[in-house]
Regions:
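Short, positively charged and aromatic/hydrophobic N-terminal segments
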Residues: 3-13
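N-terminal beta-alpha supersecondary unit
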Residues: 21-96, 102-109, 113, 128
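Short, well-ordered alpha-helices that flank and scaffold nucleotide-derived cofactor binding pockets
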Residues: 39, 120, 124
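Conserved small/polar residues in nucleotide/adenosyl-binding loops
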Residues: 131-133
C-alpha cells in the first residue's frame, strides 16, 4: 500500500504520538545505496542520527551513464552492510525502530525493487510498517 506524504504525517502524529519515533530509511532508486536513521525531537522535528551512502560512480563511469542491471546488483551486494552501518552509527538497535521507510519511486524499477524488498523483509521480521516514499 502506498501512502501519501499527508497520510504518513497523520500516521506518525495521530497513531504513534506516545514517543519519539525512530525510522530507518532505505534508498535505492538509482546508483546510490543509502540508509538513514531518523528520530523526531520534542517538537516533532526529525533529527538525522545516521546517514550512510555508497556511490556507484566508479561502476558506471566507463559506460557514460547508469546501467540498471549493474546498479541493482550493486544494491544487492551492499544494502545489508549499509543498513547495518546506519543502525550502528545511530546508536539504536533494530528493536528500537518504529517503522521502515523505503523509496518507491521515481527511479529505476530494478533498483527500487531491491530497496523495497529489503525494507519489506526488515519490516516484516520486526513486525513494523513499511512506508513507501
Amino acid at each position: 500500500m502506498l501512502y501519501s506524504y499527508i497520510e504518513i504525517v497523520l500516521l506518525i502524529k495521530i497513531n504513534l504520538m506516545k514517543k519519539k519515533h525512530i525510522i530507518l530509511g532505505i534508498e535505492s532508486s538509482c546508483d546510490e545505496t543509502a540508509a538513514s536513521v531518523v528520530q523526531e525531537n520534542d517538537q516533532s522535528i526529525p533529527i538525522i542520527l545516521s546517514n550512510i551512502v555508497s556511490s556507484q560512480v566508479n561502476v558506471h563511469k566507463e559506460f557514460g551513464g547508469v546501467v540498471p542491471e549493474l546498479a541493482a546488483r550493486s544494491h544487492i551486494e551492499k544494502i545489508d552492510l549499509i543498513t547495518k552501518k546506519a543502525i550502528d552509527e545511530s546508536g539504536v538497535k533494530f528493536k528500537d525502530l518504529d517503522a521502515i521507510a523505503a523509496t518507491a519511486g521515481p527511479g529505476l524499477i530494478v533498483c527500487l525493487a531491491v530497496g523495497l524488498s529489503f525494507g519489506k523483509s526488515v519490516a516484516s521480521s520486526l513486525n513494523l510498517s513499511l512506508i513507501h516514499i
